Amino acid sequence: MMKKVFFAAFVLLIVMGFAACSNKQVPVSTVNLQLQNSVDSLLKQGMGEYGATEGMAIVVETSTGNLRAMVGLKENSGKLVSDTTLFSKARETFLFKSASLLAALETGNVSLDDMFDTYAGIDVVGQDTIYDHNWRKGGYGELTLLQGLAYNSSIAIDKAVDMAYQDKDVFLQKLEQMGLEKDSTFKGSWPLYALGFHHIKPTSMVSFFNAIANGGKMVSLKSQDSSAIVVDSMIAKKKNIESMQKALRFFVTNGLGKKAESKMVNVAGTSGSIHTDDGIYADFCGYFPVEKPKYTVFVSYKRPEIPVSGGGMAGQTFRKIAEQIMKTCK
């Protein structure tokens, strides 16, 4: 690995030399090689510990959108090999619940203090049956919407969206206005779309959470160093961005993201684990420091079978990456 890094650096120096002779500016990579190697090591460690067949981690500088580290790994014949296609591989993710929650808050018809009955963790909506992760243990019963996100209650989020929107198309338009591309191939129901059962690229979810960390400003993710490219100066009302920031912090301090919490730095984020046709994914996306966000980090693992925990698996690696950054990239 290190030989490849040094060779790449050597080639870059040669290219820069030729460029200097021709008075042409060479794009400078945003990737921090030291951090890239650290993230690679932590991701491999997690894959071994959790028995994952795929792993991915993305580190973004919040204010600029500069990609500081990008690692994609998959198992191949008993070995872990790099796979950069994972970054743009659209798939289902329960991280999308946060986007649906923000879209619901934007209508003014719901708030984080509203109460929702999640019953015994099972709810029949039209032809769909929605399960909360703890339905076998009797569910959560009544929850505030703040608690609903903290406990990853699909029922609470679905009810909030249903209360906020009567028109599916208006809901989808709002998501697009917030920078989340529409999955035109999705054939399922509105509730399932809101929960994240459609396909979306990991980088799109990173952009969304980075915008929350950035006070509502969405910037382009980029691998070549330059000034921030603003996609949208404000993806939602300020008060609703602040509500989401509160909810994502609460997820870590009081919800299913406690294993992402660090004694070194205050973090915020959310997780999700979801069954797909090709495996079970454990995702976590968040940012830090909470007081003035500098980095947004996405971590994902894929396992062929249960148990899988977004907070317990991806969340722990998120914490380790955050602490490594605080030690070396202040």
Model-predicted regions and their roles:
Residues 39, 64-65, 87-118, 148, ...:
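Active-site SXXK
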Residues 220-221, 225-330:
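Conserved SxxK-family serine transpeptidase/carboxypeptidase catalytic domain
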Residues 71, 87-95, 180-233:
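Active-site-proximal helix/loop microenvironment
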Residues 16-26:
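Bacterial Sec-dependent signal peptides at the C-terminal "C-region" and cleavage site
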Residues 9-17:
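Bacterial N-terminal signal peptides
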Residues 127-140, 164-204:
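Mid-domain, small-residue-enriched loop/turn segments at the edges of structured enzyme/sensor domains
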Residues 63, 110-171, 230-243, 250:
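Conserved catalytic neighborhood of penicillin-recognizing serine enzymes
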Residues 30-96, 108-109, 126-128, 186, ...:
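Short pre-catalytic segments that frame enzyme active sites
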